[in-house]
Design a protein with these regions (language model features):
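Membrane-interfacial terminal anchoring regions of lipid-handling membrane enzymes
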Residues: 1-26, 36, 59-62, 133, ...
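Catalytic core of membrane glycerolipid acyltransferases/transacylases, capturing the structured
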Residues: 18-35, 47-49, 63-121
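A short, well-structured juxtamembrane/interface segment
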Residues: 40-66
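Hydrophobic alpha-helical segments typical of transmembrane helices
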Residues: 41, 78-81, 94, 103, ...
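Generic preference for hydrophobic
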Residues: 55, 69, 92-93, 200-202
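Thr-Gly-centered strand-to-loop micro-motif
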Residues: 56, 93-95, 117-118, 145, ...
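Non-catalytic C-terminal accessory region of glycerolipid acyltransferases
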Residues: 125-242
Length: 242
């Protein structure tokens, strides 16, 4: 119990400390805010909870050009994990509710990250155009195509927005599997656990220029991303049920 209380206290401290540093850096440089404040926030938060991150096929993530990174979402610890793992500047597509979070919302806004609504709106159309325009010459973009967290870890239906962005932008798409966050923060039971392992795996980049245009291309991209993630997720579920 004492160790758990310590983790909570450290979480408040690290979020406050790195959040304040992010507030200072973000107006001047999103790159510095991400690579210093956000990355170390992820690392120290994972350390506070005793989380070990195991990464596979990191070399499949291009670092010399902008990409769209799509990941499966099951816990807020997914965000801490990719923040700790990805060493270069990125921007994330987030739900508008994030703007209400202390420090995180303000830092994200100042850093130029992107915000969309849960159910889609006219504002989202403008945000999509902004992402497509900026990613061609700017940093990589990270998004969760499910649009929300999966309680049991299984893939939820994908939203179309992320795939539309990828097809319009014409940049490679890298699929990133993150497994284990739900074992640290159990959303169903609203409880936290210590000393867990989170696994991260990257898959081969998808060249969207080789896909058909329009709806067929978008659907092909969606099925490819799902085809990477789903078998791996089912393997982890089987292992946990043994």
């Amino acid at each position: 119990m004492l160790r758990l209380i310590t983790a909570y206290i450290l979480s408040v401290f690290f979020t406050t400390f790195w959040g304040l540093l992010g507030l200072i850096l973000a107006p001047f440089s999103n790159r510095l805010a991400v690579t210093i404040a956000v990355r170390n926030w992820g690392r120290t938060m994972l350390w506070a909870w005793g989380v070990k991150v195991e990464v596979e096929d990191f070399d499949k993530l291009p670092q010399d050009r902008s990409t769209i990174i799509m990941y499966n979402h099951q816990s807020s610890f997914d965000i801490l994990t990719f923040a700790a793992v990805i060493p270069f500047e990125w921007k994330a597509v987030m739900k508008k509710e994030v703007l209400k979070m202390p420090f995180v919302g303000v830092v994200s806004k100042l850093g130029g990250h992107y915000f969309v609504s849960r159910d889609g709106s006219a504002d989202d159309t403008q945000e999509v155009k902004k992402i497509v325009k900026e990613i061609k010459t700017g940093p990589s973009v990270i998004l969760a195509p499910e649009g929300t967290r999966s309680i049991d870890g299984r893939l939820l239906p994908f939203k179309k927005g992320g795939f539309l962005i990828a097809m319009l932008a014409g940049v490679p798409v890298v699929t990133m599997l993150i497994w284990g966050g739900k074992n640290v923060k159990n959303n169903a039971e609203k409880k936290y656990s210590l000393n867990k392992v989170i696994n991260v795996k990257f898959f081969d980049p998808i060249d969207v220029s080789l896909l058909p245009r329009g709806k067929k291309g978008r659907e092909k991209l969606e099925s490819t991303v799902r085809g990477y993630l789903e078998p791996e997720i089912e393997k982890y579920i089987e292992l946990e049920n043994l």
